[in-house]
Design a protein with these regions (language model features):
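Short secondary-structure capping/turn micro-motifs that flank functional sites
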Residues: 1, 15-18, 131, 193-194
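Short low-polarity hydrophobic stretches
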Residues: 1-3, 114
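Helix-rich catalytic cores of soluble enzyme domains
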Residues: 66-220
Length: 220
């Protein structure tokens, strides 16, 4: 940030007027995310609509067991359902949290399920920078390393720890994906009145500031 012209005081970064917008100008207004099946490629941005499954629920519900923690078997079933749906363009990412798989390898199993059980585009892991790199490496096996470096094959979700905080885990994952030409969604995790002002106007102002900072950082 300092090299780009921002005022950095400890962990606080202040962006001068216009810096964020100048950096954001270097990002494309739309891009194509490539799928294993080229017919399933999606264009993100512009006036395009891309529908994907829900992201991150720890619980599932079925007719026999009711509400319970999700398993890897549940995850695979949701990936299959997403693949079968004509209404969904995208396979998503963490369609549920498979709690029966250790956290340090869970991302590998989830990504493999998306790759094997669907030919739609998918999202990478963001729960640790090394897991983001694992996602890039797995895509290198699926698509070819050169193809991954020249094309977008993942769109991953980066959460901002509102108010106005980017933690090292999410920023590390963002840096990995940006360095490998992969796209990210910058999403502030905000509840009005808790991590943001009570008013709608105040909350939206904070959302805009956090998103501008996150997108600008990804373009550094």
């Amino acid at each position: 940030w300092r090299d780009a012209g921002a005022d950095v005081q400890g962990e606080r970064v202040r962006l001068p007027k216009g810096l964020a917008r100048e950096l954001i100008k270097t990002a494309p207004s739309e891009y194509t995310q490539h799928a294993r099946n080229p017919d399933r490629n999606v264009v993100v941005g512009g006036r395009n609509l891309v529908l994907a499954p829900v992201y991150g629920p720890p619980f599932v519900r079925d007719a026999a067991g009711g509400r319970r923690y999700a398993t890897m078997d549940d995850f695979k079933k949701f990936v299959k359902l997403g693949y079968m749906s004509k209404w969904l363009h995208h396979s998503g990412g963490t369609v549920c949290e498979p709690t029966d798989v250790p956290v340090n390898k869970r991302h590998l199993d989830m990504l493999l399920a998306h790759m094997q059980l669907s030919d739609k585009p998918f999202m990478g892991s963001v729960t640790e920078p090394s897991r983001a790199q694992d996602s890039v490496d797995m895509c290198g096996i699926l698509f070819g390393k050169e193809f991954v470096q020249e094309n977008t094959v993942m769109t991953s979700l980066i959460n901002i720890n509102s108010p106005m905080t980017f933690d090292d885990v999410m920023m590390g994952a963002l840096e990995v994906y940006a360095a490998n030409n992969q796209a990210c969604i910058i999403s502030p995790f905000i509840v009005g009145g808790a991590m943001a002002p009570v008013s709608v106007a105040g909350t939206l102002t904070q959302v805009l500031a956090e998103v501008l900072a996150g997108v600008a950082y990804s373009q550094l």
